[in-house]
Amino acid sequence: MRLRKKAWTNEFLNQHTYYLIKYDKKINLNEIFLNNNPTCLEIGCGKGQFLTTLALKNPNLNYIGMEKSSTITAIGLKKSLKEFQNNSKKMTNIKYLNKYAENLLEIFYTDSFSRIYLNFSDPWPKARHYKKRLTYLGFLDIYSDILIKNGFLEFKTDNDSLYNFTLEQLKLTNKWEIISNTLDLYNDQELLKDNVPTEYETKFHLANKNIYKIVIKNLK
């Protein structure tokens, strides 16, 4: 169900523009973060739990959370600011971007990111909507362009159809190499040891749903 826009959204975002990416040309990430640390991108960052946990854990990495809903962007940013405050840390390595994945190439240069995360993306179950799925070949080509060579993309889902679709799309390209692939993340100790759960993931795991995960390397 689509979340209705909250009345406070615009005011909150306008008060916190420092943490929002605005652009009229392609973005230089070194200028955005005022450093040259590697940058990771979460596409569809939801309410920010995953992004915030990683940013707190890895202060020498930069993180961008991309979300198409302005209200969810605001909720995520609010959560990030609160968690950093609770940990007595200044939030310097997270920025939020309220845009669609279709806009990636007009926003970012080639080789901008070291890692991309796709967590529990909309499966778009109707066959006619297959090009909207974030692991459709057209999107995979975009990710390959904005990732550095040998950079990684991590994909998690509870949806078996989207998981199988993703594997089929990967067969259509030679730009990627599958590094890890599991049908049950919580019974894969190697992948689980560094796993950071999302809000949805925790909910699905508690409901005894399998979590699928694929990690792929960008071969360019």
Swiss-Prot record:
Keyword Transferase applies: yes
Binding positions (S-adenosyl-L-methionine): 42, 67, 122
Keyword check for Oxidoreductase: no
Active site positions: 122
Taxonomic superkingdom: Bacteria
Pathway note: tRNA modification; N(7)-methylguanine-tRNA biosynthesis
EC number: 2.1.1.33
Pfam families: Methyltransf_4
Catalytic activity as recorded in UniProt: guanosine(46) in tRNA + S-adenosyl-L-methionine = N(7)-methylguanosine(46) in tRNA + S-adenosyl-L-homocysteine
Functional description taken from the UniProt entry: Catalyzes the formation of N(7)-methylguanine at position 46 (m7G46) in tRNA.
Protein name according to UniProt: tRNA (guanine-N(7)-)-methyltransferase
Gene behind this protein: trmB
